């Protein structure tokens, strides 16, 4: 136990010695404590870490210092040796290069530490040798080193290393021997040595040897280095430098502001001075005999040239001579200053973190040391008290002591690491400070250089532009001194005409004054008259007291007096006559009230002097007083100031009158917009509110005489409200107002702001990229909104940007309290939009000529018709506005290739605006956000299919076109049947859908008859036409006899006068049930026909027929239709016929014909011959003659079959009368009578009466067929030109045509907008009314 205790004691003593060895010197004032003191003092000055401020006694008698020196020299020697050995390494080139760089960095670090610790070794020889080593090592390219040149390249490096070692040893030996004092050896200030340290560290990172030598060998300290050294010694040097850079930036900013303001004022003044000099030069150039005229003209020219130079100088200073370079330098300084400041703050933060870590480590070390001391003392007491017992307790305490010792050692190591880290951070901070100060210095020097350059430019250019001015002024002053008074006056007198001419003109003036007492002279035709009161009065009126004898006797004195008076009143002198050498003076007499005394001309006259004094001279024959403007009186001083003098180029009084009449008075010089030019402006007489900026106008305001619009003078440049030539109403609250209130003043139900904006966009902005997508400037948009509220529809938009206009339109629609598609229809619209999401979006909208669309799926069509029916429930203003807006958006989408605004993009923009839910809360609900794609989808559908939804025809018919092009029919039988099935749901759908095809129709023209045969085969429909079409634009009507199948004699039809047209069209009832029609067609398929279907057609009765009408017709009921017209009209008034064509068509296939399968027909148009001489016979829809229905044979109208009364076969008789196309303007009237018998068969007689001029031959063709009746009703409108037609069979179900030798089917001519909707069966009441009407006929 004792041995064990002894061993433990020895171990404890050894551990204690090991722990106390590094700790004790920390608390003792030994040499190592200097380092700690230096580290503590470096908190205030980071340069102390480098030893720059540490003054060490260089006495060689201090053995401790000498031992430190020896150790440092040995360490430096080891580093040199390791660097030298790195070049002999057999590793790869990359590894060797890496090792060499590490050894070189270690060498520089050790050398810097040694020189920092021993200031006496800061020698230029050592620094030069070290720089040579660094340069040699950095200059080696290890990739080029091989076995051949290895010895040569590395030999130079070895030599430089040996030189550094030899130099270092010599300096140390000299220092130890005391040959040279440490302070006097170098002879450099301490600051210079610190500069060498920096250069040495920089060279270790790649600086060249020459830079090192320059900095290290320079015997004197430059001003720049002194500045850097002072800032390095200062604790807040970086902050001071940054503050100076900031102050320099602010100073430069102030200088730039002054220069900009000065240059702008100089340019403004130069422009004004140049303008004044131009006008003065023009005036002075016309004065022929005025003194100093040439001098002043030269002065004006010099002034103009000087102002031009001033403008050029100002422009140069604003660009590359002053403003731009200085501003660029200032911006660069601000940017780099911020970066440097952030870098310095990061370094300071690292330093503070290291200091705080060191404090924590010191406290932890002290704490662990105390714990160890306690554990050690406790173990010692235990050993002393119980040396032979308590082994376990002793072992436990020994373990505690060992653990405390281990922790204390760890804390000590951590403290050492923190101290080393703090020292490294101090060195890094010192280096960063040096670099930052150098950067700031370079920046400041560059900024000063730029400021110096621009300042020199400024004063040089100022001196260059003012130098010629003083020289010119000196020359002009010398020239003015040479003038003799009266010189120009003498020249003027010598240039006057001879005495005889003066005697005649003067005697005429005196005679005229004595006889009439007026100042007007009687002049020749080529002289200018001064009958207007604005011309100047002559100054010879004072001569009225002289008689003619005095003038003749004393001519010379008189001439002298005249000259004197002219000189006194030269301001008011008028130009002499220019013909020959004669000159006459205009004078005024007392009787005329036009006299002007000398005192008035000298200074008493107001208007004539103020307006005419610049141009008054004996040679100025164009001087005139401008007339008083219509906007005010001449007594206003502002008017006199704002009026310009008359132009010297005016040559006549008429031109002056025209100018003054068209001038806008006091605002002639103001910059005005297009809208402002429409107003008749005058000065504002009372304070009012400006309609442009909506602020109060007190001074310098303008007011329109017609509409009373008030505006600032400066606002005239941007005024957007035109003059309405009537008093402008008050401000209208337009945005955010109920739609019903806005449309009250709109006759068509569309707000003016929508029409105004869309028309302007369509006129000049359809091809602008991103229209409606790109927003306008907020300030301009708000200004335009205010203009709309102030000026309503008088706002001028031609000067505004299209994006501002589109933004205002979107803003108006967005701010409506309730959108165009009302809230109550939101769910229905969103539901319909959702239905289209799963449909094929690749359905292309292929438009037919009649306005229908093909290629769309049935589901999509059904949804579109639902949308149409839903939108028709909107109020009329909402519906019209929505249709107008969607049509406009469709035009925008048509230019999508240029403006990139497709229907989908427009839907995204206008979807949430036109379709939005009612928000009960303030915020938008999540459901409404989810509905955004559906809203966009619905608007996209409205834009793409707006023709189907809003019943818009593709090309509305023009009633004034000279020829009517051939109509192309694009709906097949299957399409018509699908429409019938779609419309069979409600009678309202039937009536509404009929409006599409009744909107653009004109007069009713019967079918044109042709001889062509039609041939139909399975899978193919070919229409072959031959023969000539008859002219349908005739004036007279003739009757053609027809023969029925029973060989009855022909009877003429009597014209039946129909009721006048109603304003609102209604749909005509249909008798044929749709289900029966579909069932029969599905069962019977396609049958062949060799006849054309019969039809009832109504035509317009001509006002003045050229030929008498024939009344050959059968009257089966023998009732006079003329006497029953009123009763018939009254009973059938609900089914008033509009100017459309109604046909009841019976498809009667012949018996025994083999059935063929039904074939779906595509849209096809019949071929017809075109006659170039045909003209449109379309009559106006309203206010035309009543129409007539002319049956050609007795019988009744078709009555729907009931029960089994009808036989399987019916007999069809068709009489076709045709006239060849020989004239222009023929009108056809066709009457059809269908006989229906209940017992055996149905006999139908079709009589076509064609009225042509008497010279036109007519033909009659009769065809008899027997078949089962199949009827389809087609309502259509026909407007045509001769030579164009379409076979009726194209409008029916698929039929089989007869061979070519059978008579051709009748054709009709249709306009491009004709359409043929099919309708469902009418109710029984309608059938009874129709049957009753047939009996009346």
UniProtKB/Swiss-Prot annotation:
Renumbered zinc finger spans (Phorbol-ester/DAG-type): 676-723
InterPro entries reported for this sequence: AH/BAR_dom_sf, C1-like_sf, F_BAR, GMIP/FCHO2-like_FCH, PE/DAG-bd, RHG29_45_N, Rho_GTPase_activation_prot, RhoGAP
Extent of Basic and acidic residues compositional bias: 369-384, 974-983, 1083-1092, 1325-1337
Transmembrane segments: none
Gene Ontology BP terms: negative regulation of small GTPase mediated signal transduction; signal transduction
SMART domains: C1, RhoGAP
Coiled coil segments of this chain: 326-443
Pfam families in the record: C1_1 (PF00130), GMIP-like_FCH (PF22699), RHG29_45_N (PF24235), RhoGAP (PF00620)
GO cellular component, one term: cytoplasm
Residues the UniProt record annotates as site (Arginine finger): 773
Residue ranges, compositional bias (Low complexity): 596-613
Biased composition (Polar residues): 1-13, 525-545, 568-579, 960-973, 1161-1177, 1295-1310
Taxonomy, superkingdom: Eukaryota
GO molecular function, one term: GTPase activator activity
Segments forming domain Rho-GAP: 737-950
Record has DNA repair as a keyword: no
UniProt keyword Methyltransferase present: no
Positions of the F-BAR domain: 225-488
CDD domains, per the entry: C1_GMIP-like (cd20816), RhoGAP_PARG1 (cd04409)
Region named Disordered: 1-20, 369-397, 513-551, 564-654, 960-983, 1016-1066, 1083-1114, 1149-1210, 1273-1337
UniProt keyword list: Coiled coil, GTPase activation, Metal-binding, Zinc, Zinc-finger
PANTHER family per the UniProt record, alphabetical: RHO GTPASE-ACTIVATING PROTEIN 29, SPERMATHECAL PHYSIOLOGY VARIANT
Functional summary from the UniProt entry: GTPase activator for the Rho-type GTPases by converting them to an inactive GDP-bound state. Has strong activity toward RHOA, and weaker activity toward RAC1 and CDC42.
Protein name (Swiss-Prot/TrEMBL): Rho GTPase-activating protein 29
Organism: Danio rerio (Zebrafish)
């Amino acid at each position: 136990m004792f041995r064990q205790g002894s061993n433990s004691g020895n171990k404890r003593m050894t551990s204690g010695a090991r722990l106390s060895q590094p700790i004790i010197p920390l608390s003792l004032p030994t040499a190592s404590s200097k380092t700690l003191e230096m580290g503590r003092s470096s908190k205030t000055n980071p340069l102390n870490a480098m030893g720059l401020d540490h003054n060490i006694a260089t006495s060689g008698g201090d053995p401790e210092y000498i031992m430190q020196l020896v150790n440092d020299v040995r360490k430096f020697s080891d580093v040199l040796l390791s660097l030298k050995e790195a070049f002999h390494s057999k590793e790869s080139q990359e590894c060797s290069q890496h090792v060499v760089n590490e050894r070189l960095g270690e060498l520089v670090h050790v050398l810097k530490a040694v020189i920092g610790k021993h200031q006496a070794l800061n020698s230029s020889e050592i620094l030069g040798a070290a720089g040579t080593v660094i340069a040699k090592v950095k200059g080696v390219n290890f990739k080029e080193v091989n076995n051949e040149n290895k010895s040569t390249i590395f030999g130079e490096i070895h030599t430089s290393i040996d030189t550094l070692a030899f130099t270092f040893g010599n300096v140390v030996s000299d220092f130890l021997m005391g040959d040279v004092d440490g302070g006097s050896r170098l002879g450099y200030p301490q600051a210079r040595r610190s500069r060498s340290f920096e250069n040495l560290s920089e060279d270790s990172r790649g600086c060249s040897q020459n830079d090192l030598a320059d900095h290290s060998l320079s015997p004197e300290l430059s001003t720049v280095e002194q500045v850097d050294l002072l800032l390095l010694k200062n604790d807040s040097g970086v902050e001071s430098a940054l503050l100076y850079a900031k102050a320099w930036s602010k100073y430069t900013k102030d200088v730039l502001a002054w220069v900009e303001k000065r240059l702008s004022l100089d340019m403004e003044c130069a422009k004004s001075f140049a303008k004044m000099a131009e006008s003065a030069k023009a005036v002075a150039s016309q004065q022929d005999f005025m003194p100093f005229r040439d001098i002043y003209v030269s002065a004006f020219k010099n002034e103009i040239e000087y102002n031009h130079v001033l403008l050029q100088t100002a422009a140069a200073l604003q660009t590359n001579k002053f403003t731009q370079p200085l501003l660029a330098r200032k911006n660069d300084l601000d940017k780099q200053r911020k970066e440097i400041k952030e870098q310095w703050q990061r370094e300071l933060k690292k330093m503070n973190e290291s200091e705080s870590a060191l404090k924590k480590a010191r406290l932890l070390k002290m704490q662990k040391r105390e714990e160890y001391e306690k554990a050690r003392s406790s173990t010692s007491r235990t050993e002393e008290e119980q040396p032979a017992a308590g082994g376990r307790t002793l072992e436990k305490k020994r373990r505690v002591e060992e653990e405390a010792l281990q922790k204390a050692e760890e804390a000590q190591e951590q403290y050492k690491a923190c101290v080393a880290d703090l020292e490294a951070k101090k060195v890094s901070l010192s280096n960063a400070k040096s670099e930052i100060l150098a950067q700031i210095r370079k920046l400041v020097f560059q900024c000063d250089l730029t400021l110096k350059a621009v300042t020199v430019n400024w004063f040089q250019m100022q001196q260059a532009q003012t130098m010629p001015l003083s020289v010119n002024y000196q020359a002009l002053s010398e020239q003015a001194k040479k003038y003799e008074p009266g010189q120009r006056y003498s020249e003027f007198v010598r240039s006057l005409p001879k005495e005889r001419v003066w005697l005649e003109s003067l005697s005429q003036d005196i005679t005229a004054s004595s006889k009439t007492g007026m100042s007007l002279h009687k002049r020749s035709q080529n002289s200018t008259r001064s009958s207007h009161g604005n011309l100047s009065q002559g100054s010879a009126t004072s001569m009225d007291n002289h008689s003619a004898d005095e003038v003749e006797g004393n001519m010379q004195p008189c001439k002298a007096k005249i000259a004197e008076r002219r000189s006194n009143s030269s301001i008011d002198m008028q130009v002499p006559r220019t013909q020959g050498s004669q000159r006459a003076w205009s004078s005024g007499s007392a009787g005329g009230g036009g006299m002007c005394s000398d005192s008035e001309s000298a200074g008493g006259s107001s208007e004539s002097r103020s307006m005419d004094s610049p141009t008054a001279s004996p040679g100025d024959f164009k001087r005139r007083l401008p007339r008083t403007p219509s906007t005010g009186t001449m007594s206003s001083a502002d008017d006199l100031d704002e009026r310009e003098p008359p132009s010297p180029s005016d040559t006549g009084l008429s031109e002056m009158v025209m100018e003054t009449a068209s001038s806008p008075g006091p605002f002639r010089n103001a910059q005005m917009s297009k809208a402002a030019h429409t107003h008749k402006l005058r000065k504002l007489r009372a304070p009012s509110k400006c309609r442009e900026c909506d602020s109060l106008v007190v001074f310098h305001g303008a007011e329109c005489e017609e509409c009373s619009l008030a505006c600032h003078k400066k606002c005239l440049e941007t005024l957007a409200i035109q003059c309405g030539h009537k008093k402008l109403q008050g401000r209208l609250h337009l945005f955010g107002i109920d739609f019903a209130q806005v449309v009250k003043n709109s006759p068509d139900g569309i707000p003016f702001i929508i029409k105004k904006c869309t028309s302007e966009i369509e006129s000049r902005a359809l091809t602008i990229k991103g229209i409606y997508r790109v927003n306008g400037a907020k300030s301009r948009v708000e200004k335009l909104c205010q203009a709309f509220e102030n000026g309503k529809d008088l706002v001028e938009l031609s000067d505004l940007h299209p994006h501002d206009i589109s933004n205002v339109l979107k803003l108006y629609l967005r701010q409506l309290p309730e959108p165009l598609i009302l809230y109550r229809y939101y769910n229905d619209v969103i539901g319909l939009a959702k239905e289209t999401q799963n449909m094929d979006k690749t359905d292309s909208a292929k438009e037919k000529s009649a306005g229908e669309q093909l290629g769309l799926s049935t589901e999509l069509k059904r949804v579109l018709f639902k949308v149409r029916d839903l939108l028709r429930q909107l109020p009329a203003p909402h519906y019209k506005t929505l249709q107008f807006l969607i049509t406009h958006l469709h035009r925008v989408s048509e230019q999508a290739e240029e403006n990139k605004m497709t229907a989908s993009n427009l839907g995204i923009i206008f979807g949430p605006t036109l379709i939005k839910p009612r928000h009960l809360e303030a915020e938008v609900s999540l459901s409404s956000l989810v509905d955004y794609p559906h809203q966009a989808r619905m608007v996209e559908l409205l834009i793409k299919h707006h023709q189907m939804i809003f019943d818009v025809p593709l090309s509305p018919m023009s009633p004034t076109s000279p020829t009517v092009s051939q109509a192309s029919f694009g709906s097949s039988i299957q399409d018509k049947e699908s429409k019938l099935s779609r419309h069979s749901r409600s009678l309202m759908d039937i009536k509404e859908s009929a409006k599409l095809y009744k909107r653009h129709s004109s007069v009713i023209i019967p079918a044109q008859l042709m001889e062509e045969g039609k041939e139909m085969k399975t899978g193919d429909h070919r229409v072959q036409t031959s023969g000539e079409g008859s002219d349908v634009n005739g004036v007279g009507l003739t009757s053609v006899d027809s023969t029925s199948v029973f060989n009855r004699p022909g009877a003429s039809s009597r014209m039946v006068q129909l009721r006048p047209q109603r304003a609102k069209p209604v749909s005509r009832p249909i008798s044929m049930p749709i289900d029966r029609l579909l069932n029969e067609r599905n069962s019977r398929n396609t049958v062949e026909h060799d006849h054309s279907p019969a039809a009832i057609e109504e035509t317009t009765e001509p006002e003045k027929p050229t030929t008498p009408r024939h009344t050959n017709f059968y009257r089966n009921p023998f009732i006079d239709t003329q006497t029953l017209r009123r009763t018939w009209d009254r009973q059938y008034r609900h089914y008033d016929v509009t100017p459309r064509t109604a046909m009841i068509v019976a498809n009667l296939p012949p018996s025994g014909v083999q059935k063929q399968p039904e074939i779906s027909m595509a849209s096809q148009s019949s071929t017809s011959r075109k006659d170039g001489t045909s003209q449109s016979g379309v009559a106006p829809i309203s206010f035309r003659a009543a129409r007539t229905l002319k049956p050609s044979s007795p019988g009744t109208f078709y009555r729907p079959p009931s029960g089994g009364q009808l036989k399987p076969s019916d007999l069809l008789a068709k009489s076709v009368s045709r006239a060849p196309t020989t004239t222009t303007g023929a009108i056809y009237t066709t009457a059809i009578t269908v006989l229906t018998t209940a017992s055996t068969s149905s006999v139908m007689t079709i009589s076509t009466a064609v009225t042509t001029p008497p010279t036109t031959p007519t033909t009659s063709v009769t065809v008899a067929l027997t078949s089962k009746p199949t009827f389809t009703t087609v309502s259509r409108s026909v407007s045509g030109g001769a030579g164009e037609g379409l076979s009726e069979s194209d409008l029916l179900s698929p039929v089989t045509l007869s061979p070519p030798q059978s008579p051709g089917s009748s054709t009709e001519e249709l306009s491009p907008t004709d359409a043929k909707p099919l309708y469902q069966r009418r109710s029984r009441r309608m059938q009874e009314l129709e049957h009753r009407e047939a009996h009346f006929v």
